[in-house]
Amino acid sequence: MDGMFAMPGAAAGAASPQQPKSRFQAFKESPLYTIALNGAFFVAGVAFIQSPLMDMLAPQL
């Protein structure tokens, strides 16, 4: 029962010390990363919709 329901890496984590997280890894795990990523996607989408490229892709009805 021990191997089937154990968390992956639980046994190995106790024996070996954890490496300190880099600044980027700590930022990537923070909620600010999700907010910044979604904000960047939103800005890119608005810029694409407002661009002349969108006018060229849309059919002229």
From Swiss-Prot:
The chain crosses the membrane at residues 32-52. InterPro entries: Tom6. One of its GO terms (biological process) is protein import into mitochondrial matrix. The modification N-acetylmethionine is found at residue 1. The keyword RNA-binding does not apply. It holds the Pfam family Tom6. Belongs to the Tom6 family. Component of the TOM (translocase of outer membrane) receptor complex responsible for the recognition and translocation of cytosolically synthesized mitochondrial preproteins. TOM6 is involved in assembly and stability of the TOM complex. This is Mitochondrial import receptor subunit TOM6. It comes from Saccharomyces cerevisiae (strain ATCC 204508 / S288c) (Baker's yeast). The lineage of its organism: Eukaryota, Fungi, Dikarya, Ascomycota, Saccharomycotina. The gene is TOM6.
